């Protein structure tokens, strides 16, 4: 080796060591996604676009909401994106888990479909399907209640949307909870089928029940609070990047989730805010208003500071549907202090759909 080559290597060594030290200093955060769903996948945007450069994000898609909640409660993951309807069960089971923010309400993606020739007045004693203990169960319960039925007035069948297609077409079901593409399959094969309500309905939307949320392990918050704050901020930064670069991010999420891009567009939209028949993406300010840590009224008449009320209403419905036995103090399952800290730090984010 000649002198100049050796000197060059020696000169480069400090930079190499510094680079290795920086890489070694990155802190790992374990994040769970309950199912392959665009609304839950914003941490993949954070990871790919390096929006949290001091952290290594380890993302796991569970395809099993209950399994993911169990992993969060056990401390195997730190953060978990899933539906808000599980929050009362977190309280009931006394696990070390809290709901730290609402993320995005359903904006018409969830429907109740009536079979041909069936009228809402004719449902007593008939079979209706919904996946037990999930959003569809609640939507069916609330809609039946709006039509004057108690849960015991119908015969419940525990079916996911895809599983309900066959029984709907065979005439075994009078009504079913569904979402696309299963709605279209039933409508095309069975003219006369009708959607009687969806989650964009004003009365359904203002309940706040049909919502996705971000959960965190309590010990993670207590022992690594700054990391929790950084991760919460990074999630909203990911949403902001999606708003500004919707086409790019939708293509990214299609590859990540292994979905056709058209399906991604249909769920989260192409305008950087929402998709009718899909979901509505809260910006940070809207989520902070629902938490009650920022002035202003969030959309859909849900009310400022309404998170505990939404959890209580969900709990009451789980009792009506006989999945829970008592109504708990809803505040035990909600921790808006992280959102409050971000507000206090001056963090803000507000955006509308692009034309």
Model-found features: residue ranges?
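Bacterial N-terminal signal peptides that target proteins for export
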Residues: 1-10
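Pocket-lining segment of extracytoplasmic ligand-binding domains
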Residues: 85, 157, 163-167, 173-264
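Extracytoplasmic/periplasmic substrate-binding proteins
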Residues: 114-116, 121-125, 212, 287-296
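C-terminal segment of classical bacterial N-terminal signal peptides
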Residues: 14-23
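Conserved C-terminal helix/tail region of periplasmic/extracytoplasmic solute-binding proteins
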Residues: 308-355
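Secondary-structure end/capping motifs
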Residues: 223-325
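Short, glycine-/small- and polar/acidic-enriched structural segments
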Residues: 26-180, 196-199, 207-208, 342
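Functional cleft and adjacent loop/helix regions within the main domain
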Residues: 65, 243, 335
């Amino acid at each position: 080796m000649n002198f100049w080559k050796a000197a060059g290597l020696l000169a480069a060594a400090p930079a190499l060591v510094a680079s290795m030290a920086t890489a070694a200093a990155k802190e790992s955060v374990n994040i769970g996604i309950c199912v392959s769903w665009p609304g839950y996948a914003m941490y993949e945007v954070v990871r790919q676009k390096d929006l949290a450069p001091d952290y290594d994000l380890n993302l796991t898609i569970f395809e099993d909401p209950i399994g993911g909640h169990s992993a969060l409660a056990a401390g195997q993951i730190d953060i978990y994106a899933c539906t808000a309807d599980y929050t009362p069960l977190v309280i009931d089971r006394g696990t070390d888990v809290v709901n730290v923010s609402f993320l995005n309400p359903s904006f018409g993606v969830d429907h109740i479909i009536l079979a041909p020739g069936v009228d809402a007045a004719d449902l007593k004693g008939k079979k209706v399907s919904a996946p037990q203990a999930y959003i569809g169960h609640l939507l069916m319960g609330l809609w039946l209640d709006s039509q004057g039925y108690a849960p015991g007035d119908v015969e419940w069948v525990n079916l996911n949307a895809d599983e309900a297609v066959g029984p709907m077409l065979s005439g075994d079901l009078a009504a079913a909870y569904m979402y696309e593409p299963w709605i279209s399959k039933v409508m095309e094969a069975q003219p006369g089928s009708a959607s009687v309500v969806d989650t964009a309905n004003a009365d359904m939307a203002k309940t706040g029940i049909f919502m996705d949320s971000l959960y965190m392990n309590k010990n993670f918050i207590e022992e690594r609070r700054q990391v929790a704050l950084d991760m919460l901020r990074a999630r909203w930064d990911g949403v902001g990047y999606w708003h500004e670069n919707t086409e790019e991010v939708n293509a990214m999420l299609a590859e990540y989730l292994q979905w056709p891009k058209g399906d991604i567009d249909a769920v989260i939209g192409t305008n950087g805010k929402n998709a009718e028949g899909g979901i509505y993406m809260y910006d940070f300010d809207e989520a902070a208003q629902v938490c009650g840590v920022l002035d202003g009224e969030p959309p859909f008449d849900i009310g400022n500071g309404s998170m505990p009320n939404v959890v209580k209403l969900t709990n009451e419905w789980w009792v009506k549907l006989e999945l829970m036995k008592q109504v708990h103090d809803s505040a035990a399952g909600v921790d808006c202090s992280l959102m409050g800290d971000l507000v206090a730090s001056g963090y803000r984010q507000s955006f509308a759909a692009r034309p």
